[in-house]
Amino acid sequence: MSEASDLDPKAVRLQFARRTQRLAGADFLLREIERRMLERLELVRVQPALIVDAGCGLGQGSVLLQQRYPAANVLGIDVSAPMAAAAAALHGMQARRSMFDRLRQLFGAAQPGAQAPLFVAADAASLPLPAASVDLVWSNLAWHWFTDPGALLQEWRRAARGGCLLMFSAFGVDSLRELRDIGVSTPRFDDMHDIGDWLVTAGFAEPVMDAERMTVTWESPQRLLSELHALGGNAVRSRGKGMRGRHFLQSRLDRLAGLAGPDGRIALSVEIVYGHAWAPAQRPLPPGFSPVHFDRGGGRGKP
């Protein structure tokens, strides 16, 4: 069972709504991990008809998945309506079409292969999709924005068709530890072994988890703080409310400056967790066999 999160879902939506225009200039790590995930995907044989990009942001990953699988329908889902609209506009979609119009196109009479992804503002933990309809669930570095990982995986399992591949990346527990050491709060990052257990509990099979560590550097405290804010900021319930003064900001910049190395750059540790698992396919019965259904009622049937 996953632990309760300190994330405020309303704050998550507001943070990303405010940062829609700033994300594109600060998403270098998202794009790099996306590239590495796509390399891993090359090793897997799948021919998905419906792909869900959970936590799609500005939709770059959705577009690359559409290019990889041109016959598939790709649905980019983000909890922020302004973010989903910006993704649609960025990639030439009509940003103002309603979610129901989009889903009607997806499950209606349209021919397979949508040419471009559909972008929908929705909760990835409550997908606007029927059960057993998705062939590939993809999520790139959005895990720490989901408030209940166990419930999230159960929802993805509900939507997954038999044989569906789940592929995702997440920040590991050692990410940004230098910030925590100087008293700067960070989101809660889950241990990959816990994630593996949650996958099994949710009903996924053959989970594979691994991690890699890297160091990311910034040229100044101001640049580091700006990019971290652009990537989502602080959305925990325990965050301070109201406006922070100039002295608070300067104190934070001074603490960050203390992390600088001899070259003046600030280095932070990042642990990237990769995971994939499968929704078990329903096994066909051997020839000549048929299912037997038992009536558990108390009455006796007629002979």
Regions found by a protein language model. Name each.
Residues D135-T147:
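A short SAM/SAH-binding and catalytic strip from SAM-dependent methyltransferases
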Residues A125-L136:
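A short acidic, Gly/Pro-enriched loop at the edge of an enzyme's catalytic core
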Residues G150-G162:
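A short glycine-rich, Lys/Arg-flanked "PGG" loop and its adjoining helix->strand segment in the class I
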Residues E212-P303:
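Conserved Class I S-adenosyl-L-methionine
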Residues L50-L127:
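Class I SAM-dependent methyltransferase SAM/SAH-binding core
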Residues R161-R223, A230-G245:
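Conserved catalytic/acceptor-binding region of the Class I
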Residues M1-G25, R31-R35, G301-P303:
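N-terminal, positively charged/glycine-rich alpha-helical extensions of SAM-dependent methyltransferases
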Residues L30-A49, Q60-L64:
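Conserved alpha-helix/loop element of class I SAM-dependent methyltransferases that forms part
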